Amino acid sequence: MFGYVQIEKSELLVKEYETYKSIYCALCKTLGKEYSVFARFILSYDFTFFAALSMGVHNQKVCFNKGRCTFNPLKKCVFCGTGNDDMKKAAALSVITAFYKLKDDIRDGRTGKKICSYLVYPFFSRWRKKAAQKYPEYEEAVSAMSQMQEQVEEDQMCHIDMAAEPTAKMLASVMEMQAKDEMEKRIFSELGYHLGRWIYFIDAVDDLEKDKKDGNFNPFLKYIKDEEDNENLKKYCNEVLNQSMCLSYNAYNLADIKRFKGILDNIYLKGLPFVQRKVLFGKGEFNDEESL
C-alpha cells in the first residue's frame, strides 16, 4: 500500500477529523513502541484506514488517551486504540509491507535510491522479522504477493489485470483475516481485492512518467505512443479505477461497521475520488507525504 487511501479533510466533521488524527497518532506510537522510533517514518494513511476499518468491525474496547507527540513534545495528541490488537496488526502489516517495498526499490530503483535502500535494509529486515513472528499469516500473504509481482513484471507486455492481481490477492487475503465468520470473509475478501486493484492502478498511473524515464515496468506504458494516447489512457484509467472503487465500496456497504463509519464513508466517497482526480488530472505528482 502506498499512501493513497486518504480522507478528504474538508468534508469531515470536526469531531470525526479529530478521531481520525487520534488513530493516525496511535498507529505512529504503536510503530515506535513495537519496533523502533525510526519505524514511525513508515507511517501511512493506508494503514490508518486498515486500523480504523479493523476497529470499526470488531467489538474490542477502544480507549482515547491524551499524550504528547514523540517528534514534537510541545504538541499535545490524543491516541485512539493504542495497544489493542487491531492497532498492533496495522503496525505489523505496515513494517512487513514496507520491507517488501524496500526490496522492490533495491531491484528497480535508481542508483541513489538503491544505495539508500541498502543502508536501511538491516533495520527494515529486523522489524519485518519481529512482525512476521507475531503475525506469520501477514508475512505469508505479503511475501507471496512480492514473489508473484516479480514474476508478472518479467513480461513487459502483460495485461493490466494480471499486473494488479498480486496486490489484489494480497489485500483480499489480509482483509479476510479480519472476518469473524464465512459471510464476513466473503465481504472482506471482495472489499480487499478491489481496493487492492485500485491501489495498484493509481500507483501505476502516478508513477507512469517516472517509470518511462527510468525504464521500469509499468503495465500502462505499452499504451502510450504520443500525447493523444496519454490523454486517452487517463480516461481509460479513470473508468478502470471507478469500477474497482465502486466494487470495493459495494462490499464495504455490506459490512457491519460498528464505529468510525463517518470516517470510513468519507474515505470511500470523498477521499479516494479526490486522490484519483488529483493523480489523473491534477497538476504535478501526487504528494502522499503530508503529515497530519
Show where each model-derived region lies:
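A glycine-rich phosphate-binding loop feature that marks nucleotide/adenosyl-phosphate handling sites
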Residues: 265-270
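Acidic catalytic motifs of isoprenoid enzymes
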Residues: 1-173, 177-190, 201-234, 238-240, ...
